[in-house]
Design a protein with these regions (language model features):
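Loop/turn elements at helix/coil->beta-strand transitions in domains of secreted/extracellular proteins
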Residues: 18-21, 56-60, 99-102
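Conserved SGNH/GDSL esterase-like catalytic core that processes O-acyl groups on lipids
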Residues: 1-47, 83-86
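Active-site segments of SGNH/GDSL-like serine hydrolases
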Residues: 25-31, 50-87
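Hydrophobic, well-ordered secondary-structure scaffolds
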Residues: 45, 49-53, 135
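Sec-exported extracytoplasmic/periplasmic mature domains
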Residues: 12, 16, 27, 50-57, ...
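Catalytic His-Asp segment of secreted/periplasmic serine-dependent ester chemistry enzymes
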Residues: 68-146
Length: 146
């Protein structure tokens, strides 16, 4: 995991290969571990997208929603976070629409009763094998379009 600024720092090594597509899922660490506002976080995300578009204009960009967390796994760390993630995902969807990018709603496929089910996570946030299977099924059809 990383924050958006860390993802930006890694872009040069990724974009030098001029990838056909990039699948971005970013912002969970920023939301969970910093006091950053949605507005500031989205500005960082937009910067990430601008760099990709500028440095690798033929790269197709897919924006993935954030995944839910399992709040009951660690109430202190994750309590109330799914509401924030839902709000952020809505803002990501809007941003993708404004920019003409594909938004992939992984949240809906991954969640049960509004959170990440225990069997799909190893620690409340990171996926287990069962979680990765759900994720792969959600993005497979987009991968084959590339």
């Amino acid at each position: 995991g990383d924050c958006i600024s860390g993802m930006i720092n890694r872009l040069p090594s990724i974009l030098q290969g001029k990838p056909k597509a990039v699948f971005i899922m970013g912002g969970i660490n920023d939301l969970l571990f910093s006091k950053i506002s949605y507005e500031k976080l989205l500005k960082q995300y937009e910067r990430l997208l601008d760099i990709i578009a500028s440095e690798s204009p033929h790269t197709k960009i897919y924006i993935q929603s954030l995944l839910p967390v399992n709040e009951s796994y660690n109430e202190k760390m994750f309590g109330g976070q799914n509401e924030r993630i839902i709000r952020y995902n809505a803002l990501l969807r809007e941003m993708a629409g404004r920019r003409g990018l594909t938004f992939i709603d992984i949240w809906s496929d991954m969640q049960q009763n509004g959170e990440l089910p225990a069997e799909r996570t190893v620690d409340g946030i990171h996926l287990s094998g069962a979680g990765y299977i759900v994720w792969i099924k959600a993005i497979r059809r987009y991968i084959y379009r590339v």
